[in-house]
Design a protein with these regions (language model features):
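Acidic, polar-rich low-complexity tracts and alpha-helical solenoid repeat scaffolds
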Residues: 1-268
Length: 268
C-alpha cells in the first residue's frame, strides 16, 4: 500500500508539471492568436533547445567522468609491477613480464579509444603506442610518429618526447637531438623547455659535444636559481634543474662552480 501511495504521488507530481506546462502554453497561445502562434512556436523551440543543451551538458559531464575513470584504470594497469609471483593480499595489478603488462594495458586502452572521443581517444592511442614498444618496437615507433601530428597538443608533445627517448635508446642520437630541440623550442606545458633541454644536453654529452651540453645544463640551472615569483621571492628549484646541476657538476666541475649560489632556504 505504501509503495502504491509513493507511486501515485509521483504520478500526481508529474501530472501537475505537465498540466502547468501545457496550461502555460495554452494561455500564452490565447494571448498570441494569429501571427502570435509563430512566436509561440519560436518560444517553445527556444525552451526545448535550452532543455537539450542542459541535457547535453549533464550527459557530457557524466561521459567525461566515465572516460577519465576508464583511462585511469588503464593507466594503473600500465604502471603495474612486474613480479615473479603476485604479492599475497595485494589489490594492485602485477604481471609476470613486461610483455604481459603491455598486452593487458593495450587491450584496456583500446576499449577507451573505441568508446570515447578526444581527448581520451588520442590519449589512449598514445599509451597504446608507448606500450607497443615492448611488443613490436617498429610498429610502436610508427604509431608514435603519426601521433606527433595529433590535434590534441598534449598528445603531440608526449608522442614526440617518447619518440625522442626511443631514438636515444636505439642510439639514433641525431634524430633524438632534433626532436628534443623542437620540443624545447615549443616549450609546451606538457613537455617544458627545461625538461627537453635536459634530455638534449644528455644526448650532446653522449655525442661528445661537451661544451654544448655544459652550456645547456648551465643555462637550465642558472635560470632556475634566478627565477622569482610574483612576490619577488625566489622560486623552488625544479627537479629538472636539480638534475641538470648534478649532470653539470659531473661533466664540467669548473663550469658548475660559476653558477650563482642556490638560495639556502630552497636548497633542500
Amino acid at each position: 500500500m505504501a509503495k502504491y501511495k509513493k507511486k501515485r504521488a509521483r504520478e500526481l507530481q508529474h501530472d501537475r508539471f505537465r498540466d502547468t506546462t501545457i496550461g502555460f502554453f495554452d494561455r500564452l497561445g490565447n494571448l498570441l492568436e494569429g501571427r502570435g502562434r509563430t512566436i509561440l512556436y519560436g518560444l517553445g523551440g527556444l525552451i526545448l533547445a535550452g532543455l537539450l543543451v542542459m541535457f547535453f551538458v549533464k550527459w557530457s559531464n557524466r561521459k567525461s567522468d566515465e572516460a577519465e575513470q576508464a583511462l585511469g584504470r588503464a593507466i594503473t594497469i600500465s604502471k603495474g609491477s612486474v613480479l615473479a609471483a603476485p604479492v599475497a593480499g595485494s589489490t594492485e595489478p602485477s604481471f609476470s613480464s613486461e610483455q604481459e603488462r603491455a598486452q593487458t594495458a593495450i587491450a584496456e586502452f583500446e576499449k577507451v579509444a573505441a568508446k570515447y572521443g578526444d581527448p581520451y581517444k588520442s590519449e589512449s592511442l598514445y599509451f597504446i603506442a608507448a606500450n607497443r614498444l615492448v611488443l613490436d618496437r617498429q610498429k610502436g615507433i610508427g604509431e608514435l610518429t603519426a601521433l606527433t601530428n595529433s590535434r590534441v597538443a598534449e598528445v603531440a608533445a608526449l608522442s614526440k618526447f617518447a619518440l625522442a627517448q626511443a631514438n636515444e635508446s636505439d642510439n639514433k642520437l641525431d634524430e633524438a637531438a632534433q626532436l628534443y630541440a623542437a620540443l624545447a623550442k615549443q616549450n609546451s606545458p606538457t613537455v617544458t623547455a627545461e625538461t627537453a633541454n635536459l634530455r638534449l644536453a644528455k644526448v650532446y654529452a653522449k655525442q661528445g659535444k661537451k661544451k654544448e651540453a655544459a652550456d645547456l645544463l648551465f643555462n637550465i640551472v642558472d635560470a632556475s636559481r634566478k627565477a622569482k615569483g610574483s612576490d619577488n621571492q625566489p622560486l623552488p628549484v625544479s627537479a629538472a634543474a636539480r638534475e641538470a646541476g648534478e649532470e653539470l657538476q659531473k661533466l664540467d666541475p669548473d663550469r658548475y662552480a660559476q653558477l650563482p649560489p642556490e638560495t639556502p632556504s630552497l636548497a633542500g
